[in-house]
Amino acid sequence: MEKSILLINGPNLNLLGTREPHIYGSTTLSDVEESSKGHAASLGASLQTFQSNHEGAIVDRIHAARGNTDAIIINPGAYTHTSVAIRDALLGVEIPFIELHVSNVHAREPFRHHSYFSDKASGIIVGLGVYGYKVAVEHVALNFKPLEKKAAL
C-alpha cells in the first residue's frame, strides 16, 4: 500500500523565492511542492501539499489528515515559536511528523530559537535550504511505517 505524506507550509512560505532570498533562496514554494511530489512518487509514496498563513486553517488541515495520512512534514514558519494550537493538533491526530525549517533558526534572532514542536517531532531538519524538503520526503518515505487508518475527526 502506498505511503501517504502531507506537506504543510505555514505563514509567509508562499513568498519563498522572493522573500529574503539571501536567507531562504530563490526557489519558489510551487517549485518545492512539485519537486517534493515527484520525489515522493519515485519512492512509492503520495504527497499532498497545503500552505496557509492562518493558524486555524493549518489546524483544520491537520485534523482532516487523520485516518488518511501516514506522516506529516511541517514547516510551521513563524508559528514554530507561538502555536500551541498547531502543536496540540499534531499530537491529537497521532500522526508522526517531521519539523522542517529552510534557514538555520538557531543562527538567527533569539526568539526563533524556541520551537513548540521539536520535543514531539520524529525528526527536525534545519538550515539545509529547500534541499531539506527532499531530505524530509526521503526519510519519511523510507523509514516511517504506514499507520492503521482511523476515522477522521
Swiss-Prot record:
Q: Does the keyword Lyase apply?
A: yes
The positions annotated as site (Transition state stabilizer) read R19
SUPFAM superfamilies documented for this protein: Type II 3-dehydroquinate dehydratase
Alphabetical UniProt keywords: Lyase, Quinate metabolism
Catalytic activity annotated for this protein? 3-dehydroquinate = 3-dehydroshikimate + H2O
- Is-annotated flag, keyword Lyase? yes
For the ligand (substrate), the binding residues are: N75, H81, D88, V102, S103, R112
Record: active site: Y24 (proton acceptor), H101 (proton donor)
Q: Give, as in the UniProt entry, the pathway in which the protein acts.
A: Aromatic compound metabolism; 3,4-dihydroxybenzoate biosynthesis; 3,4-dihydroxybenzoate from 3-dehydroquinate: step 1/2
Supply one GO molecular-function term: 3-dehydroquinate dehydratase activity
| Known EC number | 4.2.1.10
Q: Which GO terms describe its biological process?
A: 3,4-dihydroxybenzoate biosynthetic process; quinate catabolic process
Describe its partners and assembly state.
Answer: Homododecamer. Adopts a ring-like structure, composed of an arrangement of two hexameric rings stacked on top of one another.
Q: Function, please?
A: Is involved in the catabolism of quinate. Allows the utilization of quinate as carbon source via the beta-ketoadipate pathway.
Q: Which family does it belong to?
A: Belongs to the type-II 3-dehydroquinase family.
Q: What is this protein called?
A: Catabolic 3-dehydroquinase
Whose protein is this, by species?
Answer: Emericella nidulans (strain FGSC A4 / ATCC 38163 / CBS 112.46 / NRRL 194 / M139) (Aspergillus nidulans)
